[in-house]
């Protein structure tokens, strides 16, 4: 059990009778072909619409009994109360004693939410106003570099949530861009990305955004230091000063204003984060500045509005018709009860190319835990291994394993129904879009039913002479269809997955808002780096010592 700021103590789903009933149900053999054969209304029963998003989960290995027990399981851990605690600013991040109020970042200005006597909504909209002012200065050409030229390129330097979120969103919404200012992203600490990028940029017209919640992330600050050196090398030739370079070519986004100032970020160019915003939930905050620069503030506000619409649905819809709740419960059923320990995200839309990477971080960093909120070791499976790729590329990469391998894998198919303008009907581009949709539906069908069941349903005779051509089927999947990809629908889609993560964490009784598993490696890297600089032999394990010795011999 865990205590929130309002001293609410929640029940554990693990010890409810519904958990045991689901374990019993999971022991039965599940056949998707049989489930569809038994009920010709199955798809209508296991599908629903929420705003511009349609979800078909009929190809999951569930029936009415499983769904009823999953919903009862959610009630047994007081999921409704947990959702309200999240939305109202209770201390749901128990290990760090913080709220997790990413949903407040998309509340309308007319709303009010108090946290420690402070009106969070007022603070959020003050920050959004600053984002708007800075982004419009860049977009309009009034922001000038040290030589007086307008900014043509913006480089977002960040890692994790400070990189993946803005990168995913700007890529997805690039056709909404209404500026000639290009936006780039750098995250890798080895300098390769930055070095390759700087070769093609003009230092006099390049602006850098340093995004780091702590403003102490070594990956980010090492790239920022290199960027500063690159700028200063040109500024000296143009009689520019270091102060003018820092002032005209850097914006900082962090929860640590003191460190931003110490680095040299001008106070007017510092954007605030709050401790109650987790990195992987932060694209809605000032971290989204790169998005606002690329698609404009009106587009960014539509992104926020789409997410808020999903927040409302999550908070108000009955669980049986609640898309995030159902998506989360199905994920728990697959991972914990059916032992489906791998999950893949398959968007059939090139604009969503970074969505799988974004969701990999969102789910695995949030729910990759083995201890409950009250410190007990977990005796059940939690977050599956998650990966993904654009569907058409994945078909030529790992679909072989999905169709004919030995691993059980659950899948999310994501596609957009409408693409291109009405004037583009029956053009080659429109035909390509229809071909992509056809592949999306076809692949989910083959994964679900295999060649034997499909042949039978189509009135054909299945041939089993060539065993190597056998498609076993019975791979569970959910299909999510957006009416079309817009800032609003993308916001709703991202928020859907955020809430899915929270539902799963609530059932598993884990904290999805911390990430202690990333800390020790970073700390150890400091010791290893120190050892690299010293002449004497390192004092680690024999493998690490030998690797260091080899590196030193070649350096």
Curated annotation (Swiss-Prot):
Superkingdom of source: Bacteria
- Keywords, alphabetical: Cytoplasm, Gluconeogenesis, Glycolysis, Isomerase
Enzyme class, spelled out: isomerase
Gene Ontology MF terms:
carbohydrate derivative binding; glucose-6-phosphate isomerase activity; monosaccharide binding
- Does the entry annotate any disulfide bonds, and if so which pairs? none
GO cellular component terms, semicolon-separated: cytosol
Isomerase among the record's keywords?
Answer: yes
Example of a GO biological process term: gluconeogenesis
InterPro entries, sorted: G6P_Isomerase (IPR001672), G6P_Isomerase_C (IPR023096), Phosphoglucose_isomerase_CS (IPR018189), SIS_dom_sf (IPR046348), SIS_PGI_1 (IPR035476), SIS_PGI_2 (IPR035482)
Which residues are catalytic? 365 (proton donor), 396, 522
Location of this chain's protein in the cell: Cytoplasm
- What family name appears in the similarity comment? Belongs to the GPI family.
Q: What does this protein do?
A: Catalyzes the reversible isomerization of glucose-6-phosphate to fructose-6-phosphate.
For this protein, the record's PANTHER family field holds: GLUCOSE-6-PHOSPHATE ISOMERASE
Protein's name according to its UniProt entry: Glucose-6-phosphate isomerase
The record's gene field reads pgi
């Amino acid at each position: 059990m865990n205590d929130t700021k309002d001293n609410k103590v929640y029940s554990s789903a693990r010890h409810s009778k519904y958990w045991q009933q689901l374990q019993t149900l999971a022991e039965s053999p599940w056949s998707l072909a049989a489930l569809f054969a038994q009920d010709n209304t199955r798809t209508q029963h296991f599908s629903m619409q929420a705003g511009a998003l349609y979800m078909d989960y009929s190809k999951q290995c569930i029936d009415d009994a499983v769904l009823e027990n999953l919903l009862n399981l959610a009630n047994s851990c007081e999921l409704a109360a947990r959702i309200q605690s999240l939305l109202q600013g209770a201390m749901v991040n128990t290990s760090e004693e913080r709220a997790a109020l990413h949903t407040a970042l998309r509340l309308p200005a007319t709303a009010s939410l108090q946290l420690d006597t402070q009106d969070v909504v007022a603070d959020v909209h003050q920050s959004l106003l600053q984002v708007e002012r800075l982004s419009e200065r860049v977009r309009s050409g009034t922001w000038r570099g040290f030589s007086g030229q307008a900014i043509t390129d913006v480089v977002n330097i960040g890692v994790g949530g400070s990189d993946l979120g803005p990168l995913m969103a700007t890529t997805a919404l690039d056709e909404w861009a209404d500026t000639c200012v290009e936006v780039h992203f750098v995250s890798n600490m080895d300098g390769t990305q930055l070095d390759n990028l700087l070769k093609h940029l003009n230092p006099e017209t390049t602006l850098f955004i340093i995004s780091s919640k702590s403003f102490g992330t070594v990956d980010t600050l090492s790239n920022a230091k290199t960027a500063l050196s690159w700028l200063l090398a040109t500024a000296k030739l143009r009689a520019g000063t270091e102060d003018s370079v820092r002032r005209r070519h850097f914006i900082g986004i962090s929860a640590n204003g003191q460190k931003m100032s110490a680095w040299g970020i001008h106070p007017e160019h510092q954007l605030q984060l709050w401790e109650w915003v987790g990195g992987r939930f932060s694209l809605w905050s000032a971290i989204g500045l790169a998005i606002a620069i690329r698609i404009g503030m009106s587009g960014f506000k539509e992104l926020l509005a789409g997410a808020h619409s999903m927040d409302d649905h999550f908070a108000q819809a009955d669980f049986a018709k609640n898309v995030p709740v159902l998506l989360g419960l199905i994920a728990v059923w697959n991972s914990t009860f059916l032992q489906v320990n791998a999950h893949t995200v398959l968007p059939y839309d090139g604009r969503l190319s970074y969505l799988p990477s974004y969701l990999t971080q969102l789910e695995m960093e949030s729910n990759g835990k083995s201890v409950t909120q009250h410190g007990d070791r977990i005796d059940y499976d939690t977050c599956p291994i998650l990966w993904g790729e654009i569907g058409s590329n994945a078909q030529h990469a790992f679909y072989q394993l999905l169709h004919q391998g030995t691993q059980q894998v659950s899948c999310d198919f994501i596609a957009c129904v409408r693409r291109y303008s009405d004037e583009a009907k029956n053009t080659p581009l429109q035909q390509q879009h229809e071909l992509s949709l056809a592949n999306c539906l076809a692949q989910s069908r083959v994964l679900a039913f295999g060649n034997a069941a499909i042949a039978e349903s189509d009135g054909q005779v299945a041939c089993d002479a060539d065993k190597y051509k056998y498609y076993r089927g019975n791979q569970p999947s959910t299909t999510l269809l957006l009416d079309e990809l817009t800032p609003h629908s993308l916001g709703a889609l991202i928020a859907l997955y955020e809430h899915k993560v929270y539902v799963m964490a609530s059932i598993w009784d884990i904290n999805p808002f911390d990430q202690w598993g990333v800390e020790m490696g970073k700390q150890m890297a400091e010791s290893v780096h120190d050892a690299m600089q010293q002449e004497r032999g390192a004092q680690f394990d024999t493998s690490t010592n030998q690797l260091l010795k080899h590196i030193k011999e070649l350096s």
